[in-house]
């Protein structure tokens, strides 16, 4: 068999073998020596007649494999997929099944197609299954789908109301929008809010990069092939040479993409040794371009407005606002998102117990009701002559009470189950977001995710304690005593449990001080009352003239997770079983909250060191706060000393106590040295558990600073230990 020729791809130009009048690229299969192995890029948009698929197993992975009737097998072609997919996928030909080809003087004149066959997937040449559908039981995919078309899209755009829609749905909304002289009015299909957008064919909305990354990751893990048609992930070309070769590195200092030859030619000089180089990434470069100023890059984050800023945005629209760098903003928002997830995890266990308890209680109603009915019937047979009317009343009361109680429990179980399922999807979405290393993509949605989780916590209600009481307890009948004094001791019967109506009670506001502080500032301050034990004067720097031990710390104080002042304060309200006529504001029986504390004071639980910033002679360490009460933190740090032969020892450098923040900055460290940190929390009951050790290596002074992000991994280990 001859070697296959790759048509219209980087390895071969199609002009060498195809007529220039060829209007359909699928025709070029006839000009290849092996039609089953020909690949070329897809020239059509999504959902057109011609179907292509990206082949990762080909010689040129940037090419696309065409499933076409010009191949040796006109019915279907096997498409190679990624290693994460277990099955091969087949596509029925759609572009050339019913093709009419016209030649004129030996040259191709025209091609007409009339195929409308749908895309199918299967596992063999003869077996063809239905189109792959989105799993209905996935909570995460509900947050990845476009809310308007309910489809997975790689690119979605954020409306000012923070809801994301795909580009097709936005174009559809724009087509039917009300148009004025300078703008058109878009109505969000989720919240029905109106937004005035500039009248332009260009998309004026910011792209939701985090949503796109998570959707692409979900497609890769679950075997969806649509992510392979993403045209935004093409090769990055060199910005210096005229040959437009593929870029090898990106110079952060020059802000240029360079191929290998240009990199050696222009950056081999001694004056450019300080330039910083990174791998080329189309996603990173697109994300950091300001949507309002395309020539400027995003460099800072505004705390006041929760916006990403370039240099022009900062001085034009956010002058005087509290702005921080992107890496510091990622630290803040990651801590806030972790706090919101931890809040929900802290009460999820109790919610599950409540749901299980009511399911068991609901199933036991029938058996308990039959037993009670028999007891009542036998008792009233002895007293029928004088208690016939009373018997009727008691039976009606029990039946009505049982029906009313079941309705209340069914209503609580249904509403709470739906809310928990919704929150599970949101939590899964947030965990996937914490895996993201892109700063802009993460910061676009971090604050939104925190607000959504906290709103979900406020609207999840705890059941009314009256629902836990069995209905038979309201009819305490003792027929021996009733026989002797029936007229005096006959009970009046239980009071009817009042319905709460269809409206949900208004919850109390969430106490955000129960977990990690929302805001972490990065200005350094010194503490004069801390106990610091150091190995030598070269380890820590002290600037005070009275020579008191001081270390640069973060300025933001942490709000302690103190016990609420009222027993009704917490994170969740009760599900009410009050009367229909009773207003929500006047009912005090259901304004009770789930609590993080179980009533008994404990020593602090383990904490997690979630980020470190390392400089040649300084280091910043950030850690989380346990759910228990905390008075202060204590840190120990060691220097790792290696002596021959292969003998590694850790020498204590310092012990810092009475730390009132959740971060610490150390100065005058030795460059190119490995240090080990560990932190624990302390309260009135004593010190808690030490955190897992965190190893850092200070740079030698010539390289760039290092930032260690292990947030998601540390969060998962901490949650497994705590819950």
UniProtKB/Swiss-Prot annotation:
Q: Which Gene3D superfamilies match?
A: 4.10.830.40, Classic Zinc Finger, Immunoglobulins
User: Which residues does Zn(2+) bind?
Assistant: 290, 293, 313, 318
The protein's matches in SMART domains, at most eight in alphabetical order, are given as: BBOX (SM00336), FN3 (SM00060)
**Any one Gene Ontology biological process term?**
protein ubiquitination
Domain named COS is located at: 434-492
Keyword Zinc-finger included in the entry's annotation: yes
Q: Which residues form a coiled coil?
A: 382-407
Zinc finger regions (B box-type), where? 235-280, 285-326
Task: Please list the residue ranges annotated as the Fibronectin type-III domain.
Answer: 603-701
Q: Which domain of life is it from?
A: Eukaryota
Sorted keywords for this record are: Coiled coil, Metal-binding, Repeat, Zinc, Zinc-finger
Q: Which Pfam families match?
A: fn3, zf-B_box
Zinc finger feature spans (RING-type): 146-192
InterPro entries per UniProt:
COS_domain, E3_ubiq-ligase_TRIM/RNF, FN3_dom, FN3_sf, Ig-like_fold, TRIM42_RING-HC, Znf_B-box, Znf_RING
Gene Ontology MF term list: ubiquitin protein ligase activity; zinc ion binding
State the family named in the UniProt similarity comment for this chain: Belongs to the TRIM/RBCC family.
* PANTHER family per record: B-BOX DOMAIN CONTAINING (PTHR25465), TRIPARTITE MOTIF-CONTAINING PROTEIN 42 (PTHR25465:SF13)
Protein name listed in UniProt: Tripartite motif-containing protein 42
**Which species?**
Homo sapiens (Human)
Q: Which gene encodes it?
A: TRIM42
């Amino acid at each position: 068999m001859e070697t296959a020729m790759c048509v219209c791809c980087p390895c071969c130009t199609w002009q060498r073998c195809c007529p220039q009048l060829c209007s359909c690229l699928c025709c070029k299969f006839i000009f290849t020596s092996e039609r089953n192995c020909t690949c070329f890029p897809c020239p059509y948009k999504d959902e057109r007649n011609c179907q292509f698929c990206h082949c990762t197993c080909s010689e040129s992975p940037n090419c696309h494999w065409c499933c076409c009737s010009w191949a040796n097998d006109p019915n279907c072609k096997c498409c190679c997929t990624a290693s994460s997919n277990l099955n091969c996928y087949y596509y029925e030909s759609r572009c050339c099944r019913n093709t009419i080809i016209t030649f004129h003087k030996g040259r191709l004149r025209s091609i007409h197609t009339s195929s409308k066959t749908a895309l199918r997937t299967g596992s063999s040449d003869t077996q063809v299954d239905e189109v792959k559908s989105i799993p209905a039981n996935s909570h995460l995919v509900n947050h990845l789908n476009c809310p308007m078309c309910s489809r997975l899209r790689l690119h979605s755009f954020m409306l000012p109301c923070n809801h994301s829609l795909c580009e097709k749905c936005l174009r559809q909304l724009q087509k039917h929008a009300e148009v004025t002289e300078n703008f058109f009015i878009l109505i969000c299909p989720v919240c029905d809010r109106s937004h005035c957008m500039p009248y332009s064919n260009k998309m004026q909305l910011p792209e939701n990069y985090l949503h796109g990354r998570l959707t692409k990751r979900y497609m890769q893990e679950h075997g969806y092939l649509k992510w392979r048609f993403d045209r935004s992930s093409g090769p990055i070309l060199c910005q210096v040479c005229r040959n437009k070769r593929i870029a090898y590195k990106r110079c952060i200092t020059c802000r240029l993409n360079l191929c290998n030859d240009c990199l050696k030619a222009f950056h081999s000089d001694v004056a450019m040794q300080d330039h910083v180089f990174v791998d080329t990434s189309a996603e990173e470069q697109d994300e950091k371009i300001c949507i309002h100023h395309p020539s400027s890059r995003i460099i800072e984050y505004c705390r006041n407005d929760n916006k990403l800023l370039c240099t022009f945005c900062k001085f034009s629209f956010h002058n005087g606002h509290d702005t921080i760098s992107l890496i510091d903003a990622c630290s803040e928002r990651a801590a806030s998102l972790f706090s919101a997830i931890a809040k929900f995890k802290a009460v999820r266990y109790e919610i599950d117990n409540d749901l299980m308890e009511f399911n068991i209680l609901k199933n036991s109603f029938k058996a308990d009701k039959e037993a009670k009915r028999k007891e009542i019937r036998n008792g009233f047979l002895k007293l029928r002559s004088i208690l016939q009317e009373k018997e009727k009343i008691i039976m009606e009361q029990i039946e009505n009470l049982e029906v009313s109680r079941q309705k209340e429990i069914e209503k609580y179980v249904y509403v709470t189950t739906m809310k928990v399922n919704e929150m599970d999807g949101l939590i899964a979405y947030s965990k996937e977001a914490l895996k993201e290393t892109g700063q802009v993509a993460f910061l676009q949605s971090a604050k939104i995710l925190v607000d959504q989780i906290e709103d979900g916590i406020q609207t999840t209600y705890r059941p009314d304690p009256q629902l836990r009481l069995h209905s038979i307890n309201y009819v305490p009948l003792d027929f021996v005593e009733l026989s002797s004094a029936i007229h005096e001791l006959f009970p009046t019967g239980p009071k009817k449990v009042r319905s709460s109506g269809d409206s949900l009670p208004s919850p109390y506001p969430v106490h955000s001080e129960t977990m990690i502080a929302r805001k972490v500032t990065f200005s350094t301050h010194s503490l004069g009352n801390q106990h610091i034990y150091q190995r030598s004067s070269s380890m820590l720097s002290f600037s005070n003239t009275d020579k008191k031990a001081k270390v640069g710390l973060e300025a933001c104080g942490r709000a302690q997770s103190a016990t609420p002042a009222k027993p009704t304060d917490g994170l969740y309200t009760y599900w009410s079983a009050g009367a229909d006529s009773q207003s929500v504001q006047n009912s005090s029986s259901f304004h009770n909250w789930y609590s993080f504390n179980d009533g008994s004071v404990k020593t602090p639980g383990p904490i997690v060191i979630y980020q470190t910033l390392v400089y040649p002679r300084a280091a910043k360490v950030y850690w989380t706060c346990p759910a228990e009460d905390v008075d202060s933190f204590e840190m120990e740090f060691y220097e790792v000393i290696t002596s021959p032969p292969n003998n590694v020892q850790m020498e204590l450098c310092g012990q810092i106590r009475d730390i009132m923040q959740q971060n610490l900055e150390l100065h005058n460290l030795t460059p190119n040295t490995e240090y080990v940190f560990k932190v624990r929390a302390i309260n009135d009951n004593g010190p808690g558990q030490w955190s897992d050790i965190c190893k850092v290596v200070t740079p030698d002074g010539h390289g760039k600073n290092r930032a260690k992000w292990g947030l998601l991994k540390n969060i998962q280990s901490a949650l497994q230990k705590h819950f």
